[in-house]
Amino acid sequence: MKISKDKLLNKTTSHEPEFIEALELLVDDINANKEINNFGIIAFMHQLNNRMNVREKIYKFAENKNMPDPAAPIIVTGLPRSGTTFLFDILCNDADHRSPLYWEITRPLPWLEKGSWRESLRIFATDAELRFARLVVPMLDAMHKLRALSPEECEQFNTVTAKSVVYIYMSHLPNYKKFLMETDFTNVFEWHKKFFQILELSGRPLSLIHI
C-alpha cells in the first residue's frame, strides 16, 4: 500500500513550491519505509487527506479577503518533556488569551457561530476519532493527551503545509527529518496567519498563544 502524491495535490489548489517540495519529500520517505505496516499507512493517509482538505478550505475562505492581522502572540517554547504543554494549558484558562482547540485544527471550516449545534457535532466527531486513536495506540494519552476541546500546539496546524514534526512523531522518516531541520518556514507562518485570522472571526483575544 502506497500514498499517492498526485491524489493529495488534487485535493488542494494552493500549490506554492515550498509546499510541493515538502509534500513530495514526506510522501517519498513514508513510501520508502518498509517498517510501516498497513495500519500505519492508513493513519498517514487519514492525516494527510484531512490536512489537504483543511488547507483547501482555508485557502478558499481567505482568498481575496482583507481580514485584520491576528492579535500579538505569546510564544511558549522549550525542550520536549520540559513542561511547556502544562504552561500552555494554564495560559489558555485566561479568558484574555486564545489558542486553537484540537477540533478547530481538524475541522475549522465552514466557519460556525460559537456555541452552535453544528459546532457541537464537529466536537463530537473529533472526540470519536480521538477515542479510536486511543484504541489503536493505548499509550497515546501517556505521550500527549488529546481531546477535542483541549488547547493544541501549533505543530498540529503546521501539518497543512507538509512541514511539521507531527509526521516524524508518527514514524521514522530520516530524510524528511533532515529536510525539516534545514528548510525555510516562511510559508508555515503565512498559513498560521490565515488560520488565526479565521479563528478570530468568533472573537479577538488579547493575545494568541503559540507553542
Language-model region placement:
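Glycine-rich phosphate-binding P-loop
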Residues: 76-92
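N-terminal pre-Walker A segment at the start of P-loop NTPase domains
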Residues: 44-64
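Post-Walker A helix-loop "phosphate-sensing" segment adjacent to the P-loop in P-loop NTPases
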Residues: 94-103
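Phosphate-binding P-loop
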Residues: 65-71
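PAPS-dependent sulfation machinery
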Residues: 106-207
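Charged, amphipathic alpha-helical linker segments immediately N-terminal to NTP-binding catalytic cores
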Residues: 13-51
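Extracellular/lumenal mucin-like low-complexity stalks
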Residues: 1-12
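Conserved small/polar residues in nucleotide/adenosyl-binding loops
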Residues: 209-211
